[in-house]
Amino acid sequence: MERDILKFVNDEVERGYKVSLTILTDSDGSSPGKAGAMMAISENGKSIGTVGGGSLENKIMIEAKKAIIDEKDVEFEYNLGANGDLGMLCGGNVRGYTKIFYPQNKLIIVGAGHVGKAVYETAVTLDFDVIVLDDRSEYANYDNFPNAKIIVGDYEKILEEVETDKTTAIVIVTRGHAYDKVAVEKLVNKESFYIGMIGSKNKVFKTLQEIKKDAKYKDSIDKLYAPIGLDMGSNKVKEIALGILCEIFLVKNGKKPAFMRDLFQEKIKKNI
């Protein structure tokens, strides 16, 4: 059973879900759950294993689901007597630990030029699973992207075949308007939490006008971040790349750009 539970955790994380794994670390008295009992719960509601059933398990499940939402590991201890935490009659105590496992964020970089490489170099320090796509093997190779998965081929084909999920961010930084347009058309309707395209305002406007002519992109094109990234006040490639990744994390975490100093001063003013 333990192997099945661990496999469940791995499989659900691979599918892009957060998962809680609860282990009872100690018990005494007549606790229905014994030390070593395990239970895993996926963000999607699926579960496997048991930590004793009844009121105890129900309480642990509620707290484990809350831990998934809060993204926080928790230790717990419950008194199982009549006057204890759960109003149970079996007596004893149980202690345990719930750990949250997270899916690794995937970053698809379309375009292996200087901007794509700069985005990659920063992204690998942030624990992204990086995939680089290009139609030029002299750019998209393991010398330039040693820790990425490399996919080289005709853009139409490789973009059609690349797999995405809700943990995927997509950065489109190809060498030309025509390739950017193909990338947006192939990827914008696929699942992702972020998709952005580089380009000047004129280039972006032209690309969007062309894409919007096709009704199948009507509901999805608005999720495209273009021009991509934050305004860093610089044309340096590494700073542009940093602005792109900052935008990705802001979108992922449901935030907007803000200086902590300004937020702090606003809070002070409200308390005056």
Task: List where the protein language model places each region.
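Segments forming oxygen-rich coordination pockets for charged ligands
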Residues: 1-151, 165-169, 182, 203, ...
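Short amphipathic alpha-helix with an adjacent loop that forms part of the alpha/beta core around
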Residues: 156-166
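Active-site capping/gating segments
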Residues: 200, 218-249
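ADP-ribose/adenylate-binding Rossmann-like module
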Residues: 169, 174, 185-210
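Short, acidic/turn-prone active-site loops that include or flank metal/cofactor-
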Residues: 136-138, 154-158, 176, 198-203
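Beta-loop-alpha module in the N-terminal Rossmann-like domain of NAD(P)-dependent dehydrogenases
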Residues: 177-181
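Short hydrophobic/aromatic-enriched beta-strand-loop microsegments
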Residues: 150, 191-198, 217-224
